[in-house]
Amino acid sequence: MADVGWCSGAQATLMLANLMPGPAGEVGPLIAAEGPGLVVTDLSKTYPKSTKPLFTGLSFSMERQGRLALLGRNGQGKSTLIKILGGVLPPSDGTIDWRMSVSWPIGFGGGFQGSLTGIDNVQFLARLYNRPFRDLLDRVDDFAELGAALRQPVKHYSSGMRARLAFGLSLAIEFDSYLIDEVVAVGDARFQKKCEEELFGRRGDRALMMASHDTNLIGRHCDRALIIESGKAKMFDDIEEALDIYTWLRAV
């Protein structure tokens, strides 16, 4: 079982090494293996200052190359679940068994060291994943379109700039699966289209788990859905049925 680590602040970047099935340098496609790529068992989350669980007993699996939507009204725990699966937050209980490589939540910038420049953060990840720094930097620079801002400390970035940097890094390193939390809302329409083409076009053979309120986007790119409601979850193999139920829940 791949351990899922968690931490906060500057140390959060170290979570990336814990998400891989093998050493951090072995981040290549593993989709040829058999069986599910992710198995979650009895997962629960209760925040320290809350007496009521956000969700309890979540159990589900995701196939290699599967495309799973996370649906639910605001406050039901979709983003929290994405962060738990990505190692950003700890679960209160349960197990997470990743059997394929997985990205950190795309667009999540909380793992960057704020006092370092964008370039320095790219260099850190290049060392962590044993990737050529110049190649990684060129990919990030080309995709994120931050220009001279890459030479500035990340703490001076806007939330959108941090998201672009995180998105660029997520796509500069190849993973078997990608965690997505409304990431295509980053930037202007042109950049959003660029994000969609990278994730859903060029990486069409990869697994993804996506939390989004955009039912059209979900309908185009997901084949199953997990609906979270009142702390429980139900899996749907029919994406259209899931979207109908989700639309009804939002209208209640």
Residue ranges and their predicted role:
Residues 6, 19-40, 44-69, 92:
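A short, flexible loop at the N-terminus of ABC-type nucleotide-binding domains that lies
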Residues 64-69, 73-127:
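ABC ATPase nucleotide-binding domain signature region
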Residues 101, 106-177, 182-189, 197:
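ABC-family P-loop ATPase nucleotide-binding domains
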Residues 192-204:
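Helical segment within the ABC ATPase nucleotide-binding domain
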Residues 205-212, 214-220:
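Conserved H-loop
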Residues 220-227:
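Conserved catalytic segment of ABC-fold P-loop ATPases
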Residues 232-252:
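Conserved beta-strand-loop-alpha-helix hinge in the C-terminal portion
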